[in-house]
Amino acid sequence: MLRLLRLALAFYGRTADPAERQGPQQQGLPQGDTQLTTVQGVVTSFCGDYGMIDESIYFSSDVVTGNVPLKVGQKVNVVVEEDKPHYGLRAIKVDVVPRHLYGAGPSDSGTRVLIGCVTSINEDNIYISNSIYFSIAIVSEDFVPYKGDLLEVEYSTEPGISNIKATSVKPIRCIHTEEVCITSVHGRNGVIDYTIFFTLDSVKLPDGYVPQVDDIVNVVMVESIQFCFIWRAISITPVHKSSSGFQDDGGLGRPKRERRSQSI
């Protein structure tokens, strides 16, 4: 139950750049302070009772009509609500498109894309489920996956062979955020701007720098399910250290920030 609560808070408490969250352009249906849109998309990830459509629309299993179990790759019709306070898109109704309307899809060999959540990591492999894993050697040296990270895995399959061969791995989203404040530090873990999780076990820091509360920093972060957060910092660079006497000017500890997309 606690895990489901964390997922719910993570998916539905999402914060992102408004420019990043623009969905397909369809006719909107105004309703109060919300904007309803009907689109067709593809399920790109599913974890527990929550998932993503087209990597941009979050949904929970209770909005799927007929309680039909969903799988990655299924086409769906979606009624989408714009969550203005969090600059996000949330599905309020999901209808599965009957498979006979769009065919069975290719069954031969070829390159495909899988969206998955890291469940565990050892010295050699990264697991995104109990049965799907790949070598850590194919991951870019600039990015070290961590448990909870959401990854886009490009892989190939061959007829008659049940396992997959991953050819590339990258985070599904990477954002660069400038001049944000470290709001808490507890042991080896901390939070930036109340929304971005970090751990000293997996973050790039300048030599000799130790993150402290009230430090103003630039951050590179990836989408990741971490407790009640959906962003994980993979790089932290100090702009103003709290020990230097920096004080905010009434901004309540939340300096103005600028976000832009950045690929890894």
Swiss-Prot record:
SUPFAM superfamilies: Nucleic acid-binding proteins. It is found in: Cytoplasm; Cytoplasmic vesicle, Secretory vesicle, Acrosome; Cell projection, Cilium, Flagellum. Its main location: cytoplasm. Residues 242-264 are annotated as: Disordered. The keyword Cytoplasm applies. InterPro entries: NA-bd_OB-fold, S1-like_RNA-bd_dom. Keywords: Cell projection, Cilium, Cytoplasm, Cytoplasmic vesicle, Developmental protein, Disease variant, Flagellum. Residues 254-264 have a biased composition (Basic residues). Testis-specific. Expressed in spermatozoa (at protein level). Interacts with GABARAP; this interaction may be important for GABARAP protein stability. Isoform 1 interacts with LAMP2; this interaction may be important for LAMP2 protein stability. It is linked to Spermatogenic failure, X-linked, 7: A male infertility disorder characterized by a significant reduction in sperm count and motility, and aberrant sperm morphology with abnormalities of the head and flagella. Patient sperm show insufficient individualization, excessive residual cytoplasm, and defects in acrosome development. Plays a role in spermatogenesis, possibly acting in the regulation of the autophagy pathway. This is Cancer/testis antigen 55. It comes from Homo sapiens.
